[in-house]
């Protein structure tokens, strides 16, 4: 595959994440019935986003923590030229300490542990065990696709 095509597809995943996340905020935490009531004809523009207690925390068109954290991963990869878990953890923690808009309780609890930046996996395990192994946050799934794209882009660029 030509480098320019790879670059365009890679950038497309970044823009797609941000735009999709900003539009997805319109229905985040809503039931199907609420979505049907507030958006009977779907949603085509940020101006249509209902301003309830959850959504009014963001300006219309803003993305959520999902894109912020994806950008932390991207910044880390650009700086380190590899997937560096400790650098990503440091960037996540810095983002959290500077507002961390939309951060979930489980993610906050993991990052708030004192040794999170030196051992993020252990911090996550501690919080998971403290919650009796019932937490099922899915943020890792959201970010995995981007990490996979970063690795694929890097691999194809080298070959």
Which residues does each predicted region cover?
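Structured, active/binding-site neighborhoods that engage oxygen-rich ligands
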Residues: 1-159
């Amino acid at each position: 595959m030509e480098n320019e095509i790879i670059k365009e597809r890679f950038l497309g995943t970044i823009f797609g994440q941000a735009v999709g996340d900003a539009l997805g905020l319109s229905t985040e935490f809503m039931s199907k019935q609420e979505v049907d009531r507030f958006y009977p004809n779907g949603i085509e523009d940020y101006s249509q986003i209902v301003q309830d207690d959850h959504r009014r925390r963001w300006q219309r068109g803003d993305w959520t923590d999902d894109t912020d954290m994806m950008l932390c991963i991207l910044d880390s990869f650009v700086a380190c030229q590899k997937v560096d878990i400790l650098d990503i953890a440091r960037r996540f923690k810095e983002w959290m300490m500077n507002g961390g808009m939309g951060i979930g309780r489980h993610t906050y609890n993991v990052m708030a542990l004192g040794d999170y930046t030196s051992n993020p996996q252990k911090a996550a395990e501690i919080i998971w065990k403290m919650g009796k192994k019932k937490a099922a946050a899915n943020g890792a799934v959201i970010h995995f696709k981007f990490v996979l794209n970063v690795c694929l882009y890097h691999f194809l660029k080298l070959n």
